[in-house]
Curated annotation (Swiss-Prot):
Its cofactor is Zn(2+). It comes from Haemophilus influenzae (strain PittGG). It holds the Pfam family HAGH_C. It catalyses: an S-(2-hydroxyacyl)glutathione + H2O = a 2-hydroxy carboxylate + glutathione + H(+). Belongs to the metallo-beta-lactamase superfamily. Glyoxalase II family. Zn(2+) 2 binds at residues 56-57, 125, 163. PANTHER family: HYDROXYACYLGLUTATHIONE HYDROLASE, HYDROXYACYLGLUTATHIONE HYDROLASE GLOB. Its EC number is 3.1.2.6. Binds 2 Zn(2+) ions per subunit. This is Hydroxyacylglutathione hydrolase. GO terms for molecular function: hydroxyacylglutathione hydrolase activity; metal ion binding. SUPFAM superfamilies: Metallo-hydrolase/oxidoreductase. Monomer.
Amino acid sequence: MLFALPALNDNYIWLYQRENLPLIIVDLPETDKLFAWLDKQNATVEAVLLTHEHDDHTQGVSAFKKRYPTVPIYGPQECEKKGATQIVNEGKILTANYQIDVIPTGGHTKQHVSFLVDNHLFCGDALFSAGCGRVFTGNYALMFEGLQRLNTLPDETIVCPAHEYTLGNLAFAETVLVDKSAVEKSAVEKSAVEKQRIFVETQRAENKPSLPTTLKLEREINPFLQAKTLEEFTALRKAKDIF
């Protein structure tokens, strides 16, 4: 089971569960909706994963710990002050039922991490559908390196970003991407970006998430994954900042 629980203005709390096992929660922007969902599902929690320190990912930690004091909360070093109980900057996490890969994806924050659980990538604010996070550290090389790590994962990887930013990202992508495959196949055939935009507009009109996405699709529609060099990535990211 994979579920995107809307939170705050445009965040998602991701919940992942193998059948009949306790679930994993990714990021804690708030807890009221989360606790209501957990109660309704009569769910048990195995672990919480924090991708980075920003408040819109961690401000629910205190309330969560009061209700679930024994559940481990994993996160990078920068999340210790936010309430993380287990510090992980890279490597593997072994819980009772899950093996989780921790992938360094800094740049948005210095120690931002992404988590790979089975074939599900929980990438916080590092990678978005058709976009990537702002580089608040100013370290574009760190951000580029992190995205390059994610770009080595298989096509079938299910990508679970933390924000509903897809439509805005697609608008930017349409200005910078040329879909060669569509040109070669037929002048009438819509580009991958345009097709995805139509899908996302339909989803959002029905108040449904545009996510998750897949790495295969992102390789077609995401200019930041297509960037071949640090210079190209940096230029794209700076252009998106003022788009």
